[in-house]
Amino acid sequence: MQDLEDAPASAELAATTAALLGEVDHRVKNNLQLIASMILLQQRRTEDEAARRALKSVLERVNAVATVHRRLFQGDPHLFEAADFLRDLTGDLAASAGRDDLQIELDLTPVAIPAASAAAFALVASELLANALKHAFPPGVGGRIVVRLTDEGAVCVLTIADDGIGMGAEAAGFGLTLAGLLAQQLHARLETAPADPLSDRPGVRATVRVPMPRSGGG
C-alpha cells in the first residue's frame, strides 16, 4: 500500500530531476558554444600565424569537451562510450587538418569508461591525435595514423601510432606535455616510443593504459 502512495511522489521527483538535468545540459551546451565562438572569432581576427595555430588548438580542446558533454547527456550519464567518441574525434580532427595525403585507420574495441574520467580521456586522445596530424608529416609528405582502443579487463589501452618523421619533431611539444598531465588525472601514464625504430621514418607510438574500476564487490 505504501508503495502505491509513494508512486506519484517518485514520478514527480523523477520529472523534476529530468527537467533540472535538461536545463543544466542546455546551459552547459550554450556556454561551450559561446566559448568556441569567441575563440573562433579571435582566431579569424588574429594575423600572427603562431597565435592562430594556438587558438585553433584551444578550439579543438573545447570541441572535444563539448562532444563528451553531448554524448553523456544523449546516452548513459554515468558511462562514456570511448570508441564512439574516438570515431567522432578522428573525423573532426582529420577534416580540420585538411590533409588528403594522410590515411587514418581505426581499430576500436567498445569500452565504457566512468563519466568522471570522460573529459580527461577525451582531451588526452585529442592531444595525441592532433599532435600526430600536425607534427608527424611535413607538408607534401603523406602517411598513416592508426588509432587503437583495446579492453584488457583491468585497463583500457589507447594507442595512437604514425609512420611519420619521428620523435624529433614531436617530443618537446606542449600537446604531449598536456597529454601527459591529463593522463595522470586518469591514474595512467603516457608512454611514447618510435613506432618502427629501424625505419628511416620511425614514427611515434603513444600509449596510455587507463585503469578501469572493478565491477562487483570483490
At which residue positions do the language-model features occur?
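Conserved short strand/loop->alpha-helix "switch" segment adjacent to the catalytic nucleotide/phosphoryl-transfer site
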Residues: 7, 11-21, 25, 80, ...
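Histidine phosphotransfer helical core of two-component systems
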Residues: 9-12, 16-20, 32-63, 74-78
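Short beta-to-alpha transition helix within the HATPase_c
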Residues: 58, 67, 71, 78-95
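Short beta-strand element(s) in the Bergerat
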Residues: 102, 154-158, 204
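Short beta-strand/loop element within the Bergerat-fold HATPase_c
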Residues: 142-154
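Glycine-rich/acidic phosphate-handling loop/turn and adjacent ATP-lid/helix
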Residues: 153-177
